[in-house]
């Protein structure tokens, strides 16, 4: 007799500079049964990129076919190329008991909440303070002062949406944040086992 459980769709959102990318990388490195969501795109592969690992590379015609068939959870056009989240990749992993990590902004997260709320566990990552966020953005040395101000204004807007998420954490220490999200993921996996057991002879 075997107890089966679906995986969890772990959605992480944060303002730019709050540490979402670093936390995601560490979670994937440390967690078992957790994979990164692989997006689909119509752009050409760059040197070294692997189809199915970095992206699913498809023609624009194929991309639009999948959109019309309802096979894209979310999609957008960026610099003349389309990018989207393929439904099959997410659902196949979840049904196999593998959790999927998706780092997206609040708009993408809210769209997913509408489509598959029961499968989503969402975490909003906050910086310790707006001043700390400003310092982190300045340390990147990739944006000028006006761009940093724009990002900070956008961050305020994003932070105002945090109450719609299942969990909110403050990232003042990367390792502690990774540990906290790992605990959330394990708790939600156990909850799924209790809620939805299916027994096989």
Curated annotation (Swiss-Prot):
It catalyses: GMP + ATP = GDP + ADP. One of its GO terms (cellular component) is cytosol. ATP binds at residues 14-21. Residues 7-186 form the Guanylate kinase-like domain. It is found in: Cytoplasm. Its EC number is 2.7.4.8. Belongs to the guanylate kinase family. This is Guanylate kinase. It comes from Wolbachia pipientis wMel. The gene is gmk.
